Amino acid sequence: MEARLVLGSSSERRKAVLESFRIPFICVSPDFDERSIVYSGDPFKYTKELAWNKANVVRSQGFSDALIITADTVVVYKGEVFNKPESEEHAVEMLRTLSGSSHSVITTLVLMQNEKVLSASENTQVSFIDIPPQHLKTYVRSFSSLKRCGGYCVQDGGGLIIKQIEGCVYNIQGLPIKTLNQLLMEFNISLWDYLV
């Protein structure tokens, strides 16, 4: 019998990616202050710690026997981590910094059920066009930049600023499905069985 599946996330994009399969799940927003974890220079360790803490919070919210999926995604440019912008001005500054260059998008997934905890990370390289300065504010207002690490999105018209992607596009949306499926298979679940 398959475990109840819980996506521990408030991200609409993560939810939408998982909804593209027929796998039954519920979405629970973990009540966790991400600012409580300090970035120490290793984005893989940082995202793993954040995702692990989110999973533990979800487990403590009455889902102790469920299979819990959590994730954390960051943009990394020249060693600096870009999380979700704090304001429109902050989002514009992030995009200005990333304009015309390449950066990494790193997501770490944590799957937790009872005492079994697995994690894996995905790294995608993204290159931006030289974004015309006069379009930065319009972009930020058009694509809910405050809800997205790095202040941008890849879906819909958000991809207008993207020149090239090397790696998993779903990673940029916060839920790399190939990596997720590999971890789910360790719990005897395969996304292949839930294709629409």
Curated annotation (Swiss-Prot):
Under catalytic activity, the entry for this protein gives:
dTTP + H2O = dTMP + diphosphate + H(+); UTP + H2O = UMP + diphosphate + H(+)
List UniProt keywords, sorted A-Z: Cytoplasm, Hydrolase, Nucleotide metabolism
Record-annotated site: Important for substrate specificity: R13, T73, Q155
Where do the TM regions start and end? none
Kindly name one Pfam family recorded for this protein: Maf
| Family note | Belongs to the Maf family. YhdE subfamily.
Principal localization reads cytoplasm
Q: Which residues form the signal peptide?
A: none
InterPro entries associated with the record: ITPase-like_fam, Maf-like
CDD domains recorded: Maf
E.C. number(s) listed in UniProt: 3.6.1.9
What is the protein name for this chain?
A: dTTP/UTP pyrophosphatase
Q: What is any one of the record's Gene Ontology cellular component terms?
A: cytoplasm
Q: Report the GO molecular function annotations.
A: dTTP diphosphatase activity; UTP diphosphatase activity
Q: Where is the active site?
A: D72 (proton acceptor)
Cytoplasm among keywords = yes
What is the annotated role of this protein in its UniProt record? Nucleoside triphosphate pyrophosphatase that hydrolyzes dTTP and UTP. May have a dual role in cell division arrest and in preventing the incorporation of modified nucleotides into cellular nucleic acids.
Q: Which organism is it from?
A: Chlamydia trachomatis serovar L2 (strain ATCC VR-902B / DSM 19102 / 434/Bu)
**Xref: HAMAP family:** Maf
Localized where?
Cytoplasm
Gene Ontology biological process terms from the UniProt entry: nucleotide metabolic process
Which cofactor(s) does the record list? a divalent metal cation
Uppermost EC category: hydrolase
Q: Which NCBIfam families match?
A: maf
